[in-house]
Amino acid sequence: MESQQGPSSPAQSNEPEGNGNPHPTASTEVTVEGPQQAQGAEEDCGVLAPTSSLLQVTERRQPLSSVSSLEVHFDLLDLTELTDMSDQELAEVFADSDDEIPQNEPPPGLQLPPFPRAGYLRSPSWTRTRAEREKKHLSDSELHGGILDTFLAAERSKEN
């Protein structure tokens, strides 16, 4: 029976050739070669490549390695600028992060009463610096306008 089924399997693969199958020989090669290349042939649409599965694993890992930790941190910074500061837990996180860097410490002899955490809300450092930057931009444009006015006035006085 095996000898009868052996010749019948190539005959079955030849029948799809007559029906217009674009890859008739791939199915016969897959059955002859073995299970490892059969998986690669199915994944590559009939092209036999013994290392195709290794290449696919590498391709799956590439998007994870293309995102650097710096990009993730910048994305988190963008998210913090858009957060609602009315959220008490989030405000405490920002207040704790500012406490790590002491800026204006009182003298050692003078001790202030501790503030309760629930009622203590301090603006995070990034909001203070952003407000200062916005003020500088406004004053810069005012300064440029003032410089232009004084320059034009000086030019007019020279012409007269």
Curated annotation (Swiss-Prot):
<dbReference type="Pfam" id="PF04440">
    <property type="entry name" value="Dysbindin"/>
</dbReference>
<comment type="similarity">
    <text>Belongs to the dysbindin family.</text>
</comment>
<dbReference type="InterPro" id="IPR007531">
    <property type="entry name" value="Dysbindin"/>
</dbReference>
<feature type="compositionally biased region" description="Polar residues">
    <location>
        <begin position="1"/>
        <end position="39"/>
    </location>
</feature>
<protein>
    <recommendedName>
        <fullName>Dysbindin domain-containing protein 1</fullName>
    </recommendedName>
</protein>
<feature type="region of interest" description="Disordered">
    <location>
        <begin position="98"/>
        <end position="122"/>
    </location>
</feature>
<feature type="compositionally biased region" description="Pro residues">
    <location>
        <begin position="104"/>
        <end position="116"/>
    </location>
</feature>
<dbReference type="GO" id="GO:0005737">
    <property type="term" value="C:cytoplasm"/>
</dbReference>
<dbReference type="GO" id="GO:0009966">
    <property type="term" value="P:regulation of signal transduction"/>
</dbReference>
<feature type="region of interest" description="Disordered">
    <location>
        <begin position="1"/>
        <end position="47"/>
    </location>
</feature>
